[in-house]
Amino acid sequence: MAAVTLHLRAETKPLEARAALTPTTVKKLIAKGFKIYVEDSPQSTFNINEYRQAGAIIVPAGSWKTAPRDRIIIGLKEMPETDTFPLVHEHIQFAHCYKDQAGWQNVLMRFIKGHGTLYDLEFLENDQGRRVAAFGFYAGFAGAALGVRDWAFKQTHSDDEDLPAVSPYPNEKALVKDVTKDYKEALATGARKPTVLIIGALGRCGSGAIDLLHKVGIPDANILKWDIKETSRGGPFDEIPQADIFINCIYLSKPIAPFTNMEKLNNPNRRLRTVVDVSADTTNPHNPIPIYTVATVFNKPTVLVPTTAGPKLSVISIDHLPSLLPREASEFFSHDLLPSLELLPQRKTAPVWVRAKKLFDRHCARVKRSSRL
């Protein structure tokens, strides 16, 4: 059986410090006979020497573009939209192009033109249809952290100020310490403890959000944990404007009625101050929180909702929340992905990879039909 060569490309998305392969997983894959190249990345949370010590061959950032075709290129986030050259390799990454997101056809056209292949990390599933690896827990954890910080900021600052820029933390403990400090300062102003409504509370993301809320001192009685049972009646829901913080953790797989809308939010009695849209399906035509239109970033974490009644309301819609805790999130994800990566030598027959390839082929066929290729 031919040995597999993986090439870890340097992430190019601003402030993306996570990695699809960690030094830990690199060492384990090399022990299984893999050959691994790692690009030197100035923004990675991992020092390049950690990869070198794990046995990887270090190469310059961007060198994947001219690498031999037999290398499988692995990364996390999408490539720059300004890149249009054909993609000739097999790629493992999150491409965000299977749910009709803005520009999805352009992404797939690059693979079609280069005869490359995409194995989308979002759609690598086990035999039960569950994702083999996801950042959901740390997305929920980080989203809840910023949600509490924004709510607390509003208690201690005037409405003409917005939550300032945030940057990645070295570890979970440091993040929890900062959020707890902000939370206690808010309570010291006389603010009552917030009520937090989480939709999708039973999944990975929801459990991460709940874990953070507990760790910073929000009582469990103040956390409304909604899932399919509570949302089955269909939105919009009157309970959302009456919570102080609303965290959306659902994975959008089909069109649903919106959870809330401007009519519900333009209420002088609204308590809601902060919405955290962890799913951040900003460009999805079926976004269940149609009250904002931009994805926010760490440099500017919130966007104002243009309400006409009630207190100031902001949305946090960062689509790479786990990057707030890049080291722990990467280790967590890479550990779960490892068993599937170990099957790459059998990717023509291993169900997890066969399913991913079929899905890629199906969406490429859609592009070809629409462009009459």
Curated annotation (Swiss-Prot):
Known pathway: Amino-acid biosynthesis; L-lysine biosynthesis via AAA pathway; L-lysine from L-alpha-aminoadipate (fungal route): step 3/3
GO MF: mRNA binding; saccharopine dehydrogenase (NAD+, L-lysine-forming) activity; saccharopine dehydrogenase activity
The reaction(s) this protein catalyses: L-saccharopine + NAD(+) + H2O = L-lysine + 2-oxoglutarate + NADH + H(+)
Modified residues (N-acetylalanine): 2
Expression triggers: Induced by alpha-aminoadipate semialdehyde in a LYS14-dependent manner. Repressed by lysine.
Regulation of protein activity: Inhibited by p-chloromercuribenzoate and iodoacetate by modification of the active site cysteine residue. Inhibited by diethyl pyrocarbonate by modification of histidine residues. Inhibited by pyridoxal 5'-phosphate by modification of an essential lysine residue.
Motif Microbody targeting signal boundaries: 371-373
InterPro entries: AASS, AlaDH/PNT_N, AlaDH/PNT_NAD(H)-bd, Lys1, NAD(P)-bd_dom_sf
GO biological process terms held by the UniProt record: lysine biosynthetic process; lysine biosynthetic process via aminoadipic acid; protein import into peroxisome matrix
EC number per UniProt: 1.5.1.7
Effect of residue 205 to S: Prevents disulfide formation
Disulfide bonds: 205-249
Subcellular location field: Peroxisome
Record-listed NAD(+) binding positions: 130, 203-204, 227, 231, 251, 278, 318-321
Active site: 77 (proton acceptor), 96 (proton donor)
SMART domains reported in the protein's UniProt record: AlaDh_PNT_C (SM01002), AlaDh_PNT_N (SM01003)
Keywords linked to the UniProt accession: Acetylation, Amino-acid biosynthesis, Disulfide bond, Lysine biosynthesis, NAD, Oxidoreductase, Peroxisome
Entry annotated with the keyword RNA-binding: no
pH-activity relationship: Optimum pH is 10 for the forward reaction, and 6.5-7 for the reverse reaction.
Binding site for L-saccharopine: 18, 77, 101, 131, 135, 279-281
UniProt xrefs under Gene3D superfamilies: NAD(P)-binding Rossmann-like Domain (3.40.50.720)
Note: Present with 111934 molecules/cell in log phase SD medium.
Assembly description: Monomer.
Function in brief: Catalyzes the NAD(+)-dependent cleavage of saccharopine to L-lysine and 2-oxoglutarate, the final step in the alpha-aminoadipate (AAA) pathway for lysine biosynthesis.
PANTHER family for this protein: SACCHAROPINE DEHYDROGENASE (PTHR11133), SACCHAROPINE DEHYDROGENASE [NAD(+), L-LYSINE-FORMING] (PTHR11133:SF23)
UniProt-recorded name of the protein: Saccharopine dehydrogenase [NAD(+), L-lysine-forming]
